[in-house]
UniProtKB/Swiss-Prot annotation:
Name of protein: Large ribosomal subunit protein uL22
PANTHER family given in the database record: CHLOROPLAST 50S RIBOSOMAL PROTEIN L22-RELATED, LARGE RIBOSOMAL SUBUNIT PROTEIN UL22M
Transmembrane segments: none
Native organism: Campylobacter jejuni subsp. jejuni serotype O:2 (strain ATCC 700819 / NCTC 11168)
GO molecular function: rRNA binding; structural constituent of ribosome
CDD domains, sorted: Ribosomal_L22
Segments of skewed composition (Low complexity): 117-134
Length: 141
């Protein structure tokens, strides 16, 4: 297992987490190919982190999977914008840390699985019961 950490990316962590969830558990080569066509700014940074983690471990991209992709909040740059009547409003410029862990893909052995057949018993249909009540007729007087 190898890791890559990219710190202080000028990107909102909430926006980067949307992309990080997409690639988690994917093959590294497939993840980098899908990130290449995403229009988001964070996709480029996460793709760089994945390729760096693959290189750190000395693996080939097609033989590893993205075990975890975590985006943490970093320091927030604070700026001020002048507003009316001498006041000012705060501008928050969030940054984030991206941590990617890749691991060697496990080869699954294909064993025959035996599935037990369910035994079903058929019930006899319920017998209809006939009503023994007699209709009462009112006599007109």
């Amino acid at each position: 297992m190898s890791k890559a950490l990219i710190k202080f990316i000028r990107l909102s962590p909430t926006k980067a987490r949307l992309i990080a969830r997409e690639v988690q558990g994917m093959n590294a080569e497939l993840a980098m190919a899908s990130l290449k066509f995403m229009p988001n700014k964070g996709a480029k940074y996460i793709a760089n982190a994945i390729s760096s983690a693959v290189a750190n471990g000395g693996f080939e991209a097609n033989e590893v999977i993205v075990k975890s992709c975590r985006v943490d909040a970093a320091a927030v740059l604070k700026r001020f914008r002048p507003r009316a009547r001498g006041s000012a409003s705060r501008i928050r410029k969030p940054t984030s840390h991206i941590l990617v862990e890749v691991a060697k893909a496990e080869v699954k052995s294909e064993e025959k699985k035996t599935v037990a057949k369910k035994t079903t018993t058929t019930k006899a249909p319920a017998k209809k019961t006939t009503s023994t009540k007699k209709a009462t007729v009112k006599k007109e007087s």
